[in-house]
């Protein structure tokens, strides 16, 4: 199916099959469509609402066209990522959590990008911390193998996305592509925490990942609107495990953490986010640093559970607490910066 035929279907509120969506996505991602066609298609899909079949088709093409990272094994390798767009401008919780996960002995294949609507994306934060971003897939794999964590810069691995940049920017609205990033990890991880901007997406995206071969995933959205586990409110979870999706709510207290307000956790820039994260990962913490540490432990613990490194969310949080408070997580942040600096010299020589 070509994009013109798809547009006729979509404007009449008719769904596409998975194969039809694959055809259209290949046209879009290989530069065969005009910007007007892409914009119209994305808007039509949003107004109709994307189905699980359509998202599966779109994700499969993006994965197919990505520059993949080949790892020795995917067993227990985890990603923690969010769609963004929650408007809260909280510090980079999932990126900070990744270093705690690695410090707990679990390998992390972190996928991320620069900020679109927020103040600090994962790439912005890591760059501020001295991490070199423009790595080859082989270099990313070496980071994961040696340091326990590697960062896959989305724009380097999904170069076909350049064809959608103009229409997405001009629309200025959330579209299908806001959902695709977290579902298209270039290492093909099967264990994930995926934060989403709308609770209604939790179960559908868990079902998408089930169809695409994921093993253990938690898709989350907090009652106070965050695309991660919140310290201040219950968090809704759609959990994919053992081939089934279950849904439930989690309070911080369920996991041994006291609920508290998010005041003091919003940031205005990557530099401010980094300062708060270094505070949280350090041995001596300010009041806001301690609060940030609790938020990090909550999310890192969930990821350790998703990686099957822990048998329950509560056990995962306990492991994350130990990894953070030993100072090992902060050491991992500095270690990744030093390790990637060697690759920078190689690549720019």
Curated annotation (Swiss-Prot):
Q: Which residues bind Mg(2+) 1?
A: 94, 228
State where 5-phospho-alpha-D-ribose 1-diphosphate binds: 82, 85-86, 92-95, 110-118, 122
Q: Which reaction does it catalyse?
A: N-(5-phospho-beta-D-ribosyl)anthranilate + diphosphate = 5-phospho-alpha-D-ribose 1-diphosphate + anthranilate
Which Pfam family name is an example for this entry?
Answer: Glycos_transf_3
* Annotated metabolic or biological route of this protein: Amino-acid biosynthesis; L-tryptophan biosynthesis; L-tryptophan from chorismate: step 2/5
Q: Which residues bind anthranilate 1?
A: 82, 113
A GO cellular component annotated for this chain's UniProt record is: cytosol
Q: So where does anthranilate 2 get bound?
A: 168
Give EC number(s), comma-separated. 2.4.2.18
Keyword set includes Magnesium: yes
Q: What's an example of a GO molecular-function annotation for this chain?
A: anthranilate phosphoribosyltransferase activity
Reported cofactor(s): Mg(2+)
The name of this protein is Anthranilate phosphoribosyltransferase
Q: What gene does the UniProt entry assign to this protein?
A: trpD
């Amino acid at each position: 199916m070509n994009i013109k035929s798809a547009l006729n279907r979509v404007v009449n509120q008719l769904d596409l099959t998975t194969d039809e969506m694959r055809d259209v996505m290949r046209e879009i991602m290989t530069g065969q469509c005009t910007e007007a066609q892409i914009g119209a298609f994305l808007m039509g899909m949003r107004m109709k609402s994307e189905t699980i079949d359509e998202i599966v088709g779109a994700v499969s093409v993006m994965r197919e066209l990505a520059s993949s990272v080949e790892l020795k094994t995917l067993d227990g390798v985890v990603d923690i990522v969010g769609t963004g767009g929650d408007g809260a401008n909280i510090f980079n919780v999932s990126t900070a959590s990744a270093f705690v996960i690695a410090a707990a002995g679990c390998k992390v294949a972190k996928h991320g990008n620069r900020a679109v609507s927020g103040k600090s994306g994962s790439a912005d934060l890591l760059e501020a911390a001295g991490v070199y971003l423009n790595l080859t897939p082989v270099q990313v794999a070496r980071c994961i193998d040696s340091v326990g964590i590697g960062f896959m810069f989305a724009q380097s691995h999904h170069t076909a996305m350049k064809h959608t940049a103009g229409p997405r920017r001009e629309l200025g609205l959330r579209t299908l592509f806001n959902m695709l990033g977290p579902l298209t990890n270039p290492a093909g991880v099967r264990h994930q925490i995926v934060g989403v901007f709308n609770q209604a997406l939790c179960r559908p995206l868990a079902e998408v990942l089930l169809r695409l071969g994921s093993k253990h995933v938690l898709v989350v959205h907090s009652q106070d609107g965050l695309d991660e586990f919140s310290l201040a409110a219950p968090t809704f979870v759609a959990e994919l495990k053992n081939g089934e999706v279950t849904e439930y709510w989690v309070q911080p207290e369920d996991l041994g953490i006291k609920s508290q307000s998010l005041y003091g956790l919003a940031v205005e820039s990557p530099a401010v986010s980094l300062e708060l994260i270094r505070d949280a990962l350090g041995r001596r913490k300010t009041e806001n640093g301690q609060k940030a540490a609790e938020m990090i432990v909550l999310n890192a613990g969930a990821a350790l559970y998703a990686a099957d490194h822990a048998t329950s969310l509560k056990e995962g949080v306990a492991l994350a607490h130990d990894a953070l408070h030993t100072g090992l997580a902060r050491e991992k942040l500095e270690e990744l910066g030093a390790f990637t600096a060697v690759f920078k010299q190689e690549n720019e020589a």
